[in-house]
Amino acid sequence: MIKVVPKVLVMSGYGINCETETAHTFQKAGAKTDIVHINDLIAGKKKMADYEIIMFPGGFSYGDDTGSGNAFANKIKNNLFDDLKEFINSGKLILGICNGFQVMTNLGLFALPSTDYGERISALEANTNNRYECRWVHIKENESICVFTKGIDIIHVPIAHGEGRFYCDEKTYLELKENKQIVFTYCDSEGNPANKEYPLNPNGAYYDIAGICDKSGRIMGLMPHPERSLYSISEPEYQLKKEIAKRNGEIIPEFIESNIQIFKNAVEYFNK
């Protein structure tokens, strides 16, 4: 059987700044990528329908003015939302990381069984310590319906955000939980819940939530950056781990497999 190589539209423009490493990670996972400025979509030079995956990367779109991800989301709402809904209804995939998650939250892409796309169900607010957090954390997959996280348990990933505190009301939380839409939660290295305690939970996120998906499992957003932790050499204490492995006659793998697996799962979705 001929393997399908999905095309990824990596969104760019107005302060998004993680498009290069995000495109690189998808390429290593087996996809083709185009970095596309949002204005080229609005002008019709590029079309969402020509792609299988839309990627909203991290960054600081519009400098986080009017709130993180808000202005970029409004640009999409006012110019591209019909195209985006058509893309969703065609059964394709959407992923958002950090600022991309914030944009998608403002767009209302994380529909519940009781809501439709375009209805906002949650928020990503300022970290409780009012500080920009830039370090590594552990997150655990919650046996969700998300297609991006098949075979993933605990992963070690960097964060870089000042507004990452997930919030929703109790009714929404219960529906997310019931429908297995809570994808990642903050934890310790053994997978024990952070219980909203700092520094395991870096931003005070309600219920330790680091990432969620929509009711179909095809649309995911998360605050941590797996695309920035593709290679083992990027991990903290890499040199120490390398030396220990050397003394044991072992070799550290090139990739952090659990992190690239998110992107491989997206590619494999089109080869079922």
Swiss-Prot record:
Top-level taxon: Archaea
Pathways involved: Purine metabolism; IMP biosynthesis via de novo pathway; 5-amino-1-(5-phospho-D-ribosyl)imidazole from N(2)-formyl-N(1)-(5-phospho-D-ribosyl)glycinamide: step 1/2
Disulfide bonds: none
Pfam families: GATase_5
Main location: cytoplasm
PROSITE patterns on file: GATASE_TYPE_1
Domain Glutamine amidotransferase type-1: 8-243
Subunit record text: Part of the FGAM synthase complex composed of 1 PurL, 1 PurQ and 2 PurS subunits.
NCBIfam families xrefs: FGAM_synth_I
Identification of the protein by name: Phosphoribosylformylglycinamidine synthase subunit PurQ
